[in-house]
Amino acid sequence: LGIFFSDDDMYKRKDKSNIINHKEYVSYIGNVDTFKILVFAKAVELKYWEYESIVFISDGATWLRNMIDELFPEAIQILDKFHLIENTYDYAKFIFNEDIKKVEKFKDKIIGYCYSREYNLIAKELKKYKDVTIPKTICNLPVYLENNKNKIDYSTYEHNGWFVGSGAIESSNKTVVQLRLKQAGMRWSIEGANYMITLRCMWESNHWDKIEKIVTDYIY
């Protein structure tokens, strides 16, 4: 699932948090090549080149980084802070054998270094545990941060008013996809699910008039 919105689609609450008034959605179950087409088509539809800055928030997955590098090489990429916190916490729990005080201290230190832009200290801290074998079920934090080291300047991102977390995508997964596809007793083929997801994206993007026109033109 991909979400598109601009500064014009947001307003600030009294507590300075942002609310997104309007979002555009694309979604697809299957290979990345088809998803890339949908993402780029939506960006073109929204005339992405007219915006001063193009910003992507993601969980740092390799396929997403590669897709953005290919389609939007000028874009600013942000590693979702809350994914980083979660991965740091899980890594620390393994390293420190569930000692929560040490886990919290380690997590706060890593995130603090991100905010102070002391990336060399992140590398120095993680180097202490380079000989520890990490289970595949746990994020290899040194590799994860090395791959995303140019996407963790959270002080600058927040100063610019950009989102640093993917809460919008997490909540939209529930409202756009799961709310319709995961009701009691439902079973879907991939093809059928993709048809329904497309309709859901059009509905939640306030483009249902386009679906009505397609149906009307087909009937008449």
Set out the residue ranges of the language-model regions.
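Catalytic center-proximal scaffold of phosphoryl-transfer enzymes
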Residues: 1-220
